[in-house]
């Protein structure tokens, strides 16, 4: 029962530990792929739900220390992750290798100007920027539609996110509240992660941009996730 779980959130052993066990199991399966970006989205989303559920700050401090050590270990055992971090700090140190994607992404965003080159007139998507239809779709949008396109995309995402959190706030039952908050936290964090990657603020993660990146099944699941809290907001059942 969600209400009983909320009462137990102050008790790490009864309320939080079972959730963490399931989380670490799922995270471990994802890392076997390996897919570090998706794993981090799930972990951060669950941590956000625990915070809303009323878990004490001492727990988050301890979890943060463990998380830093764990991420450090994952970076050490997988050299390509370290290469991504180093290329993020200085992509020009390896412009034809680990820094290639970031450099080509910036080449796409920079020349777009105010209005861009026009629809389907991108140059970087023609064998310059890898995965322009998935991870780096925002770079192509920036190149073809310029700063105006960037503003429109960011505004649409902010509208979706704000609306989703309003639904969470207005939910009449705890399950609907946690469901809508978790979904919107996941979508907003994934979008933020992707946008930060394409502008070179964080290392490449391989995370796609919700609603816009290529993939029919991904789009279908994202739309289903976003619409699922709405009936609960209306009926409270």
For the regions a language model picked out, list residue spans one by one.
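Long extracytoplasmic/lumenal interhelical loops at the membrane interface
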Residues: 109, 113-148, 171
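Residue-level marker of motif borders
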Residues: 29-30, 111, 201, 208
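Hydrophobic aliphatic residues
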Residues: 89, 109, 223-224
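Transmembrane alpha-helices of multi-pass inner-membrane enzymes
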Residues: 202-228
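Hydrophobic alpha-helical transmembrane segments of multi-pass inner membrane proteins, especially
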Residues: 3-101, 139-200
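Single conserved hydrophobic/aromatic residue that forms the stacking wall/gate
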Residues: 1-2, 226-237
């Amino acid at each position: 029962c969600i209400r009983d779980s909320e009462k137990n959130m102050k008790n790490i052993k009864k309320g939080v530990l079972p959730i963490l066990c399931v989380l670490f199991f799922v995270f471990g399966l994802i890392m076997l792929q390996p897919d570090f970006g998706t794993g981090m989205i799930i972990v951060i989303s669950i941590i956000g739900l625990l915070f809303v559920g009323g878990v004490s700050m001492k727990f988050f401090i301890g979890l943060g220390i463990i998380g830093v050590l764990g991420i450090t270990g994952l970076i050490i055992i997988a050299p390509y992750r370290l290469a991504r971090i180093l290329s993020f700090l200085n992509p020009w140190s390896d412009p034809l290798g680990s820094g290639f994607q970031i450099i080509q992404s910036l080449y796409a965003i920079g020349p777009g100007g105010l209005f861009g080159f026009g629809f389907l007139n991108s140059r970087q998507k023609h064998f310059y920027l890898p995965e322009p239809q998935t991870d780096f779709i925002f770079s192509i949008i920036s190149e073809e539609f310029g700063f105006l396109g960037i503003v429109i995309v960011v505004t649409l995402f902010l509208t979706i996110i704000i609306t989703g959190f309003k639904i969470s706030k207005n939910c009449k039952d705890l399950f609907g509240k946690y469901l809508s908050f978790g979904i919107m936290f996941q979508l907003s964090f994934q979008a933020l992660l992707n946008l930060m990657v394409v502008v070179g603020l964080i290392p490449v993660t391989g995370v796609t941009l919700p609603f816009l990146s290529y993939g029919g099944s991904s789009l279908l699941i994202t739309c289903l996730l976003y619409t699922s809290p709405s009936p609960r907001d209306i009926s409270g059942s």
